[in-house]
Amino acid sequence: MPVLKKEIELSDGKKIWVRQASGMEKLPIENIQAKIFRKTRHFGADPAEWTPEQNEEFADMLDEAGGGMADQIQAWIPNCVIEPADFDINTLTSEEVRTILSFVRGDTLEGAVPLG
């Protein structure tokens, strides 16, 4: 599947173009996530069936290993906001960061078009 891009409207009405993180960009964090998942396989194969405590332990382990949400944001968002070229990512609100991250990592694809 190709890397996609999408126009996202910010809370102040500005629009930015964002692309998904590539496989090569995602690889280091995905490796961390896989290692932590293997360490917690005794929780069960389906994370949707884990207890809240198990989910919290998993999230804490991800954070400690460098694969948590903050790590994803820092690794991917600066490179994935592609237009305008001079956009200052430090002006994004927390809600905007979460919206962008959801697209960048491939959770939401609505309205996306191929990058090329």
Language-model region placement:
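Short, surface-exposed, charged amphipathic helix/loop patches that serve as local interaction elements
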Residues: 2-4, 19-116
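Short acidic-hydrophobic surface loop/beta-edge motif
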Residues: 4-13
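Short N-terminal binding/cap micro-motifs at the start of the first secondary-structure element
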Residues: 16
